[in-house]
C-alpha cells in the first residue's frame, strides 16, 4: 500500500495554547513485514495448484496464468482476451461477459455492469448515490449497503455487489479451467490503489463465493509495473503508472529499487474513464438526432443501448483511423441512424476530460515532491490509454518522454497478477521473480509508557520502505532505544519483539528538540534493515532483522489475532490511561518552561502569578510521583483540568483567549 509520511499537520489552536504547548511527543514509526520470496513459502505452495491472475475491472476483466516461466493471457469462448464485466438475466437464463453485454440494448433493466463502483461501499455513500441515478438497473438499500434488484425467472431478486462480482470472477475461473483442462481454486486478484479495506475484503469475499481462494489482493499499478519488468532494474527508478480504464482513472507514482516497490503517491478520479468519453459522443449525436427529427430519443432505453454499443466501437476504431461511420438500423421509431465521427471531433468533444487526467498526474508529483524530469518510466494501463490524444498529452506533459508500450494496456494488470500467481504456485522458472507479500501482523515501535505505536496494519502489501522523524523524551537525553515489535495488542509487552538497537551520542538538548530520522527498508526476501540517524550530527546506527529471527508461526499469529479481539476493550482502557498520563506530564512540563522563560510568558506576568502557576505545577508533579501507578484515566484528566483552571485566569488576562481544549493540542511525536 501507499508510503505515508506521518508529519501530522497541526490543528488550529489559540494563542493561549501556542504559549503553553510545545512540540513534546514524537511518533516512532517503524514496521516489519513477513517474508515475500517464493522460496520461503514451501509447504503451502504444494496445495495451491495453478494460481491464476485476475484483473477484475469496472468495464472489462482479464485473466492470465504463468506456466514454464511464460505468461499467457487467456481467451474466452468468444475468442476475446478481455471479457466485459457484465451480468444479465433473461427470462430463460443468466448471462455473463460478452453474451450479457451483447444483449444489453434489448434488456437494459436486467443487465448489471459497473458493479465495481458499488462493491465494499455503503448505500449512503455520495458516489453510490450519484452512480445509482445513471444505472438502468435498480440499486436498493439493504442493511445500509447497496444491493442490485433485478427480476430473475420473473421473480424479484436482490443481489449483493459481491455476488455479482463473483459471477464475473466465476466466468474468469471458467475461462482458465477451459484453457488448463483442470480445476482452478486459487487466484491473485487486483484492485485499484485507492480501494480501502472494506472494498478489498469484499473483493476477496466475491472470490470465495466464486469458489476461489484469493491468495492476494494486489494493487493494480504495482501489478502493471511488474508486467513491464521494471522490478528487474537494479537502479532506483521513479515510475508513473497511468491507468485510464472504462470507469475509473488511477495515477500512481512508484519508486522501484532492487525489487522494492514503494508507492509514493496515488491520485485519481473514480468517475472518469472510457465510458465518460462515450457519453460525450452520445450526447453530441443525441442532440443532432433530436434536432433533425424533433424527438427525444433519450426516453427510448433500447435505442440508447444501441447507440452506446456503436459509439464504443467507433471510439476504438478512431485509435487507428481518422474517421468512422456509425450505422444503426431501426434506431428509433423504425428510423435508421447514420452519422460520421472523425478523430478530430472525438478529441474536440473530450478535450477537457483528456486534460483533466493530467491534474492527478501533477498531484502525485507534488505530493511526492518529485519533478517531471525525475520520472524514469511512464506505464500505460487501461484500454483508454490507446487514444492517441491521451498519449500525446501525457508525453507532452513529460517533455516529450515516450510512454512504455511493451504490453497490451488492457492486459498489463492481469499479466502482473499472473506473474505473482506463478510465484505463489511455485511455477518452474520463477526463481528470480519476486512476489510482493503482505505482513501477517501489525508492526510498530514502542513509545513512552510501553505503548505499541502501530505503523503498518497487518495485511499490508510488501516490499516497502518507511521513514519518520523522531525525537527525545527527556531533557539532555543522550540515547534513544528503538524497539521493533509485531502484534495486534495495544501494549508492546503483549506483542512480539523483533529486534532493538540504540542510537547514542545525541548532543544535550531539551526534550523534543533533536531530530532523529528512523527509516526501515524491507526487501523482497523478508530482510528488514532499520536505520536511525541524528540529523544534527549525522551519526547513524542500523540493524538487520531477517525473516527467520523472532518470527511467529501461523498458529501463534492466529492466537494473537484472537487475543486482540478478546482483549480489545482492556487494551483500549490501558492505552487511554497511558495517554492521559502523558498528556498531563507534557502539559505541566510545558507550563513550567513557559513561566520560567523571561523572554516569553515569564517576562509578561507578575511574580505572584508566576509563583501561583509554579506551585500548581509542583503539586501536580508530586501527585504524579505518589499516584501515577494506581491512578485512573479520569484521575489524570481531573489533575490536568485543575492545573488548567489555575493557569487560565492568569493567561487570559494577557491574551483574552478561550481555554485550550484537548482537541486543540498540537499533534506531535510519541516519545520513545
UniProtKB/Swiss-Prot annotation:
ATP binds at residues 57-60, 116, 246-248, 312-319, 383-386. GO terms for molecular function: ATP binding; ATP hydrolysis activity; ATP-dependent protein folding chaperone; protein-transporting ATPase activity; unfolded protein binding. InterPro entries: ATPase_NBD, BIP_NBD, Heat_shock_70_CS, HSP70_C_sf, HSP70_peptide-bd_sf, Hsp_70_fam. Disulfide bonds: none annotated. Gene3D superfamilies: 1.20.1270.10, 3.30.30.30, 3.30.420.40, Actin, Chain A, domain 4, Substrate Binding Domain Of DNAk, Chain A, domain 1. Induction: By heat shock and tunicamycin. Not induced by carbon source starvation. It catalyses: ATP + H2O = ADP + phosphate + H(+). Residues 145-299 are annotated as: Nucleotide-binding (NBD). Its EC number is 3.6.4.10. Keywords: ATP-binding, Chaperone, Endoplasmic reticulum, Hydrolase, Nucleotide-binding, Signal, Stress response. The chaperone activity is regulated by ATP-induced allosteric coupling of the nucleotide-binding (NBD) and substrate-binding (SBD) domains. In the ADP-bound and nucleotide-free (apo) states, the two domains have little interaction. In contrast, in the ATP-bound state the two domains are tightly coupled, which results in drastically accelerated kinetics in both binding and release of polypeptide substrates. J domain-containing co-chaperones stimulate the ATPase activity and are required for efficient substrate recognition. GO terms for biological process: ERAD pathway; fungal-type cell wall beta-glucan biosynthetic process; IRE1-mediated unfolded protein response; karyogamy involved in conjugation with cellular fusion; post-translational protein targeting to membrane, translocation; response to unfolded protein; secretion by cell; SRP-dependent cotranslational protein targeting to membrane, translocation. Belongs to the heat shock protein 70 family. PANTHER family: HEAT SHOCK PROTEIN 70KDA (PTHR19375). This is Endoplasmic reticulum chaperone BiP. It comes from Aspergillus niger.
Amino acid at each position: 500500500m501507499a508510503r505515508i509520511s506521518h508529519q501530522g499537520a497541526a490543528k488550529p489552536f489559540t494563542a493561549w495554547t501556542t504559549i503553553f504547548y510545545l512540540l513534546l511527543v514524537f511518533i516512532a514509526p517503524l514496521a516489519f513485514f513477513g517474508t515475500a520470496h517464493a522460496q520461503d513459502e514451501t509447504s503451502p505452495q504444494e496445495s495451491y495448484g495453478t494460481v491464476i491472475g485476475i484483473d477484475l475491472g469496472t468495464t472489462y476483466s482479464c485473466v492470465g496464468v504463468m506456466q514454464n516461466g511464460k505468461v499467457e493471457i487467456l481467451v474466452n469462448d468468444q475468442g476475446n482476451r478481455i471479457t466485459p464485466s457484465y451480468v444479465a438475466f433473461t427470462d430463460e437464463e443468466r448471462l455473463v461477459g460478452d453474451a450479457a453485454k451483447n444483449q444489453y440494448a434489448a434488456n437494459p433493466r436486467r443487465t448489471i455492469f459497473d458493479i465495481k463502483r458499488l462493491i465494499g461501499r455503503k448505500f449512503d455513500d455520495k458516489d453510490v448515490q450519484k452512480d445509482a441515478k445513471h444505472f438502468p438497473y435498480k440499486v436498493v438499500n439493504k442493511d445500509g449497503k447497496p444491493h442490485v434488484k433485478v427480476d430473475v425467472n420473473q421473480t424479484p431478486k436482490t443481489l449483493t455487489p459481491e455476488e455479482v462480482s463473483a459471477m464475473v470472477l466465476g466466468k474468469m475461473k471458467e475461462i482458465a479451467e477451459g484453457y488448463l483442462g483442470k480445476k482452478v481454486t486459487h487466484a491473485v486478484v487486483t484492485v485499484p490503489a485507492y480501494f480501502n479495506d472494506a472494498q478489498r475484503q469484499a473483493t476477496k469475499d466475491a472470490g470465495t463465493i466464486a469458489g476461489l481462494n484469493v491468495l492476494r489482493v494486489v494493487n493494480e499499478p504495482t501489478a502493471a509495473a511488474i508486467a513491464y519488468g521494471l522490478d528487474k532494474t537494479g537502479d532506483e527508478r521513479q515510475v508513473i503508472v497511468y491507468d485510464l480504464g472504462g470507469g475509473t482513472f488511477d495515477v500512481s507514482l512508484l519508486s522501484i529499487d532492487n525489487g522494492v516497490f514503494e508507492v509514493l503517491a496515488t491520485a485519481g478520479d473514480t468517475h472518469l474513464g472510457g465510458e465518460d468519453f462515450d457519453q460525450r459522443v452520445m450526447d453530441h449525436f443525441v442532440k443532432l438526432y433530436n434536432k433533425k427529427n424533433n424527438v427525444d430519443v433519450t426516453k427510448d432505453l433500447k435505442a440508447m443501448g444501441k447507440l452506446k454499443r456503436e459509439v464504443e466501437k467507433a471510439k476504438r476504431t478512431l485509435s487507428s483511423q481518422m474517421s468512422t461511420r456509425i450505422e444503426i438500423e431501426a434506431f428509433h421509431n423504425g428510423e435508421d441512424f447514420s452519422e460520421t465521427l472523425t478523430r478530430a471531433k472525438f478529441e474536440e468533444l473530450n478535450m477537457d476530460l483528456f486534460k483533466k487526467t493530467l491534474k492527478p498526474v501533477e498531484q502525485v508529483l507534488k505530493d511526492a515532491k518529485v519533478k517531471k524530469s525525475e520520472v524514469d518510466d511512464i506505464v500505460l494501463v487501461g484500454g483508454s490509454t490507446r487514444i492517441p490524444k491521451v498519449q500525446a498529452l501525457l508525453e507532452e506533459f513529460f517533455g516529450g518522454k515516450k510512454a512504455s508500450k511493451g504490453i497490451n494496456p488492457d492486459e498489463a494488470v492481469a499479466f502482473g497478477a499472473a506473474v505473482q500467481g506463478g510465484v505463489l504456485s511455485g511455477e518452474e522458472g520463477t526463481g528470480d521473480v519476486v512476489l510482493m507479500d503482505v505482513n501477517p501482523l501489525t508492526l510498530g515501535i514502542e513509545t513512552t509508557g510501553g505503548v505499541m505505536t502501530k505503523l503498518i496494519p497487518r495485511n499490508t502489501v510488501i516490499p516497502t520502505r518507511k521513514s519518520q522523524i523522531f525525537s527525545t523524551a527527556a531533557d539532555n537525553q543522550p540515547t534513544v532505544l528503538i524497539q521493533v515489535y509485531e502484534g495486534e495488542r495495544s501494549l508492546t509487552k503483549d506483542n512480539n519483539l523483533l529486534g532493538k538497537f540504540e542510537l547514542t551520542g545525541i548532543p544535550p538538548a531539551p526534550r523534543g528538540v533533536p531530530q532523529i530520522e528512523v527509516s526501515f527498508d524491507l526487501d523482497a526476501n523478508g530482510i528488514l534493515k532499520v536505520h536511525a540517524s541524528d540529523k544534527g550530527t549525522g551519526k547513524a546506527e542500523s540493524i538487520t532483522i531477517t525473516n527467520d529471527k523472532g518470527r511467529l508461526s501461523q498458529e501463534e499469529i492466529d492466537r494473537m489475532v484472537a487475543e486482540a479481539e478478546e482483549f480489545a476493550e482492556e487494551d483500549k482502557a490501558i492505552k487511554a490511561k497511558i495517554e492521559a498520563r502523558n498528556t498531563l506530564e507534557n502539559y505541566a512540563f510545558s507550563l513550567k518552561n513557559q513561566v520560567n522563560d523571561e523572554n516569553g510568558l515569564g517576562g509578561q506576568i507578575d511574580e505572584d502569578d508566576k509563583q501561583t502557576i509554579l506551585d500548581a505545577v509542583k503539586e501536580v508533579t508530586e501527585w504524579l510521583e505518589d499516584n501515577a501507578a494506581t491512578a485512573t484515566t479520569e484521575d489524570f484528566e481531573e489533575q490536568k483540568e485543575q492545573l488548567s483552571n489555575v493557569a487560565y485566569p492568569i493567561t487570559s488576562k494577557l491574551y483574552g483567549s478561550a481555554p485550550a481544549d484537548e482537541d486543540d493540542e498540537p499533534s506531535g511525536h510519541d516519545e520513545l
